[in-house]
Amino acid sequence: MVSIKTRLSGIELDNPIIPASGTFAFGEEFKSLYDLNILGSISFKGTTVEERPGNALPRIAECPGGMLNSVGLQNPGVKKVVEEELPRLGKFFKKPLVANISGFSLEDFAVLSEEMDKVENVGILEVNISCPNVSHGGMAFGTDAKSVEAVCKVVKEKTKKPVYMKLSPNVTDITEMARAAESGGADGLSLINTVLGMRIDIKRRKPVLANKVGGYSGPGIFPIAVRAVYAVHQAVKLPLIGMGGISRAEDVLEMMMAGASAVEVGAENLVNPRVCEEIITELPILCERLGIEDIQDIIGII
């Protein structure tokens, strides 16, 4: 009997599949498609202190190998998320959640961490220091090692829950940021966030996104993500959530062999809303075919 169970900082997951923040909202749109309780967890919509309307339209554009997005962290703000969205989500999803938080100052991260620490069905805090959609805030933290460490320390002071820092690929050396997070007391890391990109409409002679640049995601960034996970796994002794272009069961095994203990599936949810269900069904079959009895045995074997 193949086991596809895995663990993140003492939390056991039935499988390593987690829909990524920003592509699954609060699960409401997906619950009619399949039983969401088959998922390992859900990383719900990125939350800020105050409500954010997001960036101007257009803010999503298809491109070869994936998509560009510049949504701009649209969300109702932490108060509404904690008081309305999470209780609603808890009615149909009975497992610990991954709370994705994003701040524009150390004070923001402190407030968000304190609020999420009170929520019983939040299992892990995923700290977004790398969002490329916002012109002020996230990138400044995620591209400077001292800032990464400082944010991590602030969050750790305000919560007893495991803290996973979400790293940006838009840096010279992602392992430097990983080590900084480890020094700050991180319990784990999530990587990678989207890769900065841009497309131009040659007829209109204007960028396709109103914000001009956005985050590139989808299968096109998968090799970049695998390399980053591998490098970070060699550099630090922390559990990793791997993400970036995952669209099939084979990708999950590849990412785990590189060093991830679990994975997040992002852009593919927008292409195929049942992709997570399909991967969970296929994963044990693929493991059996490859002679893998316990999926945790392959973590970081490369």
Predicted regions and their residues:
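N-terminal capping/small domains of soluble enzymes
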Residues: 1-97, 102-104, 279
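Alpha/beta enzyme core
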Residues: 32, 83, 106-241, 250-258, ...
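Short gly/pro/ser/thr-enriched loop/turn and capping motifs at secondary-structure boundaries
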Residues: 48-53, 132-134, 196-199, 270-272
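Phosphate-coordinating loops and pocket residues in cytosolic domains that bind phosphorylated ligands
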Residues: 35, 257, 300
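C-terminal helical cap(s) of enzyme catalytic domains, especially alpha/beta-barrels
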Residues: 55-64, 200-214, 256, 268-293
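A short, charged, Gly/Pro-tolerant segment at domain boundaries
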Residues: 296-302
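Short donor-sugar binding/catalytic loops of nucleotide-sugar-dependent glycosyltransferases
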Residues: 246
